[in-house]
């Protein structure tokens, strides 16, 4: 094959790859836009009603997409809930090592308050999946911060019970505050919580 022909084939190959990359970029944008529309529709519906009574058809109608389009992105509304939990908890439980337990727990309360439009209904309705995921995060990130003092203060109490106490009390405290305790600041409520656990800093 002559050099001229090889050069022509190379230019054709480069052109084809460029066209394909543009097509993929456009397709990726379309996919991202569609997923965002579905996700936002889901959030808006959570602002209006409990998760359990939201239907896939309502999400489809609100997002203005076809049924086949919805199912090409999400197999069920449960996967939407899973994505919500992942996005929420990823930021929620990020921790700066310089933060004290009080400041870290205050950050969690503030984040729930900031996202309460689509989170409060899940929390207050005690959605099973949401609560299970929240408990896992609290066990992993919150309990270790207070475990040492608790175990020292209550050496005869099983660690599993202490962990259960920390996690369930946190959820109940957060629920109480979101429902009827907002006359108190996040910092004040966290102080109540830590004092009840007897691990507050002096």
Model-derived features with residue positions:
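Basic, helix-initiating cap at the start of DNA-binding domains
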Residues: 4-49, 58
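C-terminal peripheral helix-coil segments that are non-catalytic and often amphipathic
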Residues: 9, 13-18, 110, 176-202
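Short amphipathic alpha-helical segment with a characteristic S/N-K-E followed by hydrophobic residues
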Residues: 38, 53, 65, 76-81
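Append "Primarily bacterial transcriptional regulators
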Residues: 38, 57-62, 70, 112
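Amphipathic alpha-helical linker/stalk segments
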Residues: 44-48, 54, 84-108, 119-121
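Short hydrophobic/aromatic patch on the recognition helix
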Residues: 64-73, 170
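Amphipathic alpha-helical packing segments from all-alpha helical-bundle domains
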Residues: 127-172
